[in-house]
Amino acid sequence: MASNAKRRALEPERLPERNEEEEDDMEGDNSDESDDIEDDESEEEEEVNEEVNIDFEAYTISDTDSEGIKKLLKQLFLKAHVNISELTDLLIQQNHIGSAIKQAESQEDSDDDDDDDVDHVFGFISLVNLTERKGTSCVEQIKELILTRCEENCEQSMVEQFDKVLNNNSKPVGFLLSERFINVPAQIALPMHQQLQKELADTQRTNKPCGKCYYYLILSKTFVEAAKTSKGRVGSQAKEELMFANAEDEFFYEKALLKFSYSVQEESDTQLGGRWSFSDVPMKPLRTVMLVPADRMNSIMDKFKEYLSV
C-alpha cells in the first residue's frame, strides 16, 4: 500500500557561505559586520524552516524493522515494565497484518542499500489480540500496566469495568498500536488504518491469528498544560484540555466506551511544549487509555477523513 502523504523535515543547520567581498567588508567595518550577522541569522532561519517533501510507503513488517519498531514502542511505554523485545517479535511473527512506514525507495536508493540490513522505520501500525495471546509475557504485562494505572487514577467502578473486559474470553480485545515519529503527518494514518481493517477482515475470514476483536484497546501519547493538573490523580481528563500527539487519537477518544489518563512525567525526558509545537507552554506528558467498541471504527474513520479534508 502506498501513501501520498508528505513529511515535513528540518534540514541540518549550516553556516551560510560568504564570498571574498563579504569577508573584506567585515574586516573593514564593524557596522557592516553586525548587518551581515543579522542577514546570516535570517538565512539560517529560512533554511531550518524549509519544507522537504518525502514520499512514504507502507511495507509488510519484517525482521529488518525490529530496531525501528522497538524505538517507537519505547517512546510509547517509556519506563513501564513491558517486554518491548518480545512484543516486537510478536508483531513481526504475525506480519499478515500491520505495516511499517518507510521512505519510498528509488532505484538508486535500492542499489545503495543492498548491503544495509536495517531499514529506517518512520512509523508502524499493527494489532495484538490480547485474548488470543493470553499468557504471553508482554501481553500480561500490558494488561497489568493498564489495570495498575487505572487503580491509581480512577474510581473502583472504572477499575472493575476494565478488569472485566480484559479478562472476558468471549469478547476479544485487540491492542491497537499506531505509532510514528512526531514529524510524520497525520495524513498517512488514514490509509494505514483502512488497510489494517481490510487485513483484519481477511484474517477473520481465513481463521488466522488475531481474528475478530470486539473491542480495541488504545494507549495514546497525550499532553496537558501543567498548570491545569493537580498533584493528585489525573483520571478523567477533559477532552478540551488534552492534546494528542497523534491527531487521529482524538476521534478514538470521542467514541471510547471507557477512558482515563495517567501521568508519565517522571518517566519522560520531554517536559516542554515547544518540542511538540505547543507554543513552549510547560506541558505534562500523559498516557491516555481508551477502550473502543470495534463497531465504531467506521464512524471514527469517517470523522478522521472529514478532519483531513478541511
Curated annotation (Swiss-Prot):
- The primary gene name is bccip
**In what ranges is there compositional bias, type Acidic residues?**
19-54
Give the subcellular location. Answer: Nucleus; Cytoplasm, Cytoskeleton, Microtubule organizing center, Centrosome, Centriole; Cytoplasm, Cytoskeleton, Spindle pole
Q: What does this protein do?
A: During interphase, required for microtubule organizing and anchoring activities. During mitosis, required for the organization and stabilization of the spindle pole. May promote cell cycle arrest and DNA repair.
Q: Which InterPro entries match?
A: BCP1_family (IPR025602)
Q: List the disulfide bonds.
A: none
Q: Which organism is it from?
A: Xenopus tropicalis (Western clawed frog)
- According to the record, the segments passing through the membrane are none
Residues annotated as region Disordered? 1-59
Principal cellular location given in the protein's record: nucleus
A single GO cellular-component term on record: centrosome
In Swiss-Prot or TrEMBL terms, this protein is called Protein BCCIP homolog
Q: Please report which protein family the annotation says this sequence is part of.
A: Belongs to the BCP1 family.
Q: Where is the composition biased (Basic and acidic residues)?
A: 8-18
**Isomerase is among the record's keywords:** no
**Which key words are in the record?**
Cell cycle, Cytoplasm, Cytoskeleton, DNA damage, DNA repair, Nucleus
Biological process terms from the Gene Ontology for this record are: DNA repair; microtubule anchoring; microtubule cytoskeleton organization; mitotic spindle assembly; mitotic spindle organization
